């Protein structure tokens, strides 16, 4: 794993303004003034000598050559952040932009008898930590949009075999040329989780535990496990909860990593209520609770369903626009009646609980328990009979779901007499707000975001509004109808299973 954040690296001696650096491609860069420092290095404005600029559009990050973080970050940029690669991805995914800083070059230089490593990157603007509220919060619409933008970035870097490992507001920067855009920077803790297509194996190492920013780092990192894609998704979930609520359950114990790990474990084990109760006045954490349910259900080497996660944060697919703190963004304060907040939280708890229970029934959770899906399959191959029975059970579940979906949905609106209106952010999100009027509006509108749940087992979106449980109730699915369906199904499947059992015994 890459070096820990708490390892002590000395900052380099400041370079004089005007010093010329030669990168490995033969390009020359003139240093401007120092504009900041990271955890391990200094950052300068930079100007290419072949194209004079009045306003610097590049920066140079400088560290001692022996420092590990810049080396890790440099390898990431060399493999992942080339301009042509990002451009092709944007076209392929039909994005307006991708929030990864562009990489322009790197090299080594000498100064006062010491060797330094430097990297030239795109210049970015201010970080979100500096522009958040006094308690570090953002509007809910902004939080959800930031989550979607970060999922775009994570999907790209995960596809290129890397994880970030240190998502937080201080590492999210606005664009310099276009402050409507947000970028994920600082890849000093980036990790190649799947070199050459071979995913790292799950292995706990307490000596490497609690790596990253303790407030947001994942449970795997607490255990000393090499980071994987689920770590980034989990970290993003904690960040969104912090940005919306202004606090996290373990903030008073940040000096005790073990206590933080325990608090995170409790939060994930007690979803969704553990997240919903942190909702600020006049808002809710339904989307974030559902997001963390999905993150917690991922196996160690499982690929997240990025589109489904985006659907959780933006269920109506409304086009993204400027962030509300950018030059064009505007916002309107939303007031939600106290009674509505109570009803919404009860409904959200009910629906997310159903979704969570369904995940538990469909997936073996013995790992978070210690093994990835791939390792488990290799170490414990199922016998033929058990495999067939498992497939039959899954098919039966799918059949029951299809049958249930064909029934007319129950009208749950009687207990929630309301309609959905929206507070509009120009070219941005519409944030749901309940008005308590006619229930008829639900016949024309789509379901609120907290009625949607995405299973990581399948790529579809299940509408939980049309169901009062994971299985049909007596009013939806009578005993005779179920029996008839089962008889027809098992008349076919039982002979097939018996034949497979016979063949298996014959050849053993």
From Swiss-Prot:
PROSITE patterns: PROTEIN_KINASE_DOM (PS50011), PROTEIN_KINASE_ST (PS00108). The modification Phosphothreonine is found at residue 336. Residues 29-319 form the Protein kinase domain. Its EC number is 2.7.11.1. ATP binds at residues 35-43, 61. GO terms for cellular component: cytoplasm; endoplasmic reticulum; endoplasmic reticulum membrane; mitochondrial membrane; nuclear envelope; nucleus; protein-containing complex. Gene3D superfamilies: Transferase(Phosphotransferase) domain 1 (1.10.510.10). The keyword Mitochondrion applies. The active site is at residue 166. Keywords: ATP-binding, Cytoplasm, Endoplasmic reticulum, Host-virus interaction, Kinase, Membrane, Mitochondrion, Nucleotide-binding, Nucleus, Phosphoprotein, Serine/threonine-protein kinase, Transferase, Transmembrane, Transmembrane helix. Isoform 1 and isoform 2 are expressed in various tumor cell lines. Expression of isoform 1 inversely correlates with ERBB2 in breast carcinomas (at protein level). Widely expressed. Highly expressed in fetal liver, skeletal muscle, pancreas, heart, peripheral blood leukocytes and testis. Pfam families: Pkinase. CDD domains: STKc_VRK2 (cd14123). GO terms for biological process: cellular response to oxidative stress; DNA damage response; protein autophosphorylation; protein phosphorylation; regulation of interleukin-1-mediated signaling pathway; regulation of MAPK cascade; signal transduction. It comes from the Eukaryota. GO terms for molecular function: ATP binding; protein domain specific binding; protein kinase binding; protein serine kinase activity; protein serine/threonine kinase activity. Residues 397-508 are annotated as: Interaction with MAP3K7. It catalyses: L-seryl-[protein] + ATP = O-phospho-L-seryl-[protein] + ADP + H(+); L-threonyl-[protein] + ATP = O-phospho-L-threonyl-[protein] + ADP + H(+). SUPFAM superfamilies: Protein kinase-like (PK-like). The chain crosses the membrane at residues 487-507. Serine/threonine kinase that regulates several signal transduction pathways. Isoform 1 modulates the stress response to hypoxia and cytokines, such as interleukin-1 beta (IL1B) and this is dependent on its interaction with MAPK8IP1, which assembles mitogen-activated protein kinase (MAPK) complexes. Inhibition of signal transmission mediated by the assembly of MAPK8IP1-MAPK complexes reduces JNK phosphorylation and JUN-dependent transcription. Phosphorylates 'Thr-18' of p53/TP53, histone H3, and may also phosphorylate MAPK8IP1. Belongs to the protein kinase superfamily. CK1 Ser/Thr protein kinase family. VRK subfamily. Isoform 1 interacts with MAP3K7, MAP2K7, MAP2K1 and KSR1. Isoform 1 and isoform 2 interact with RAN and MAPK8IP1. (Microbial infection) Isoform 1 interacts with Epstein-Barr virus BHRF1; this interaction is involved in protecting cells from apoptosis. This is Serine/threonine-protein kinase VRK2. It comes from Homo sapiens.
């Amino acid at each position: 794993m890459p070096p820990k954040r708490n390892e002590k690296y000395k900052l380099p001696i400041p370079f004089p303004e005007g010093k010329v650096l030669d990168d490995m491609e033969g390009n020359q860069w003139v240093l401007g003034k120092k504009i900041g420092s990271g955890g391990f290095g200094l950052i300068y404005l930079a100007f290419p000598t072949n194209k004079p600029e009045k306003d610097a559009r590049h920066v140079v990050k400088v560290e001692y050559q022996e420092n590990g973080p810049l080396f890790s970050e440099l390898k990431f940029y060399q493999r992942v952040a080339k301009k042509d690669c990002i451009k092709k991805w944007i076209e392929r995914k039909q994005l307006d932009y991708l929030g990864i800083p562009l990489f322009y070059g790197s090299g080594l230089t000498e100064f006062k008898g010491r060797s330094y490593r430097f990297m030239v990157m795109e210049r970015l603007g201010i970080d979100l930590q500096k522009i958040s509220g006094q308690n570090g919060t953002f509007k809910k619409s902004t939080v959800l949009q930031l989550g979607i933008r970060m999922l775009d970035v994570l999907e790209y870097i995960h596809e290129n075999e890397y994880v970030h490992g240190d998502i937080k507001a201080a590492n999210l920067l606005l664009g310099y040329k276009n402050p409507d855009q947000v970028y994920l920077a600082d890849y000093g803790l980036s990790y190649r989780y799947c070199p050459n297509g071979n995913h790292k194996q799950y292995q706990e190492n307490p000596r490497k535990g609690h790596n990253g920013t303790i407030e947001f780092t994942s449970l795997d990192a607490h255990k000393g496990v090499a980071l994987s894609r689920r770590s980034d998704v989990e970290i993003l979930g904690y960040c969104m909860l912090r940005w919306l609520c202004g606090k996290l359950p373990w903030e008073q114990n940040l000096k005790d990593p073990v206590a933080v790990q325990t608090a995170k474990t409790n939060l994930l084990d007690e979803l969704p209520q553990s997240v919903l109760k942190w909702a600020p006045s006049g808002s809710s954490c339904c989307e974030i609770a559902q997001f963390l349910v999905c993150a917690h259900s991922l196996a160690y080497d499982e690929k997240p369903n990025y589109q489904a996660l985006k659907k959780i944060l933006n269920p109506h697919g409304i086009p993204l626009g400027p962030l509300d703190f950018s030059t064009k963004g505007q916002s309107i304060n939303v007031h939600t009646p106290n009674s509505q907040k109570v009803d919404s939280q009860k409904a959200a708890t009910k629906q997310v609980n159903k979704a969570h229970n369904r995940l538990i029934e469909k997936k073996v959770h013995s790992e978070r328990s210690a093994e990835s899906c791939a390792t488990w399959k290799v170490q414990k191959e199922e016998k033929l009979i058990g495999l067939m029975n498992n497939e039959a059970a899954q098919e039966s579940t799918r059949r029951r779901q299809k049958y249930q979906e064909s029934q007319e949905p129950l009208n749950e609106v009687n207990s929630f007499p309301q309609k959905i209106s929206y507070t509009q952010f120009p070219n941005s999100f519409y944030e749901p707000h309940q008005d308590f009027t006619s229930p008829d509006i639900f016949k024309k509108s789509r379901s609120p975001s907290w009625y949607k749940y995405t299973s990581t087992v399948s790529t579809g979106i299940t509408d939980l509004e049309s169901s009062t449980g994971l299985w049909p109730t007596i009013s939806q699915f009578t005993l005779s109808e179920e029996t008839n369906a089962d008889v027809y199904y098992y008349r076919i499947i039982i002979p097939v299973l018996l034949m497979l059992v016979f063949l298996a015994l014959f050849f053993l």
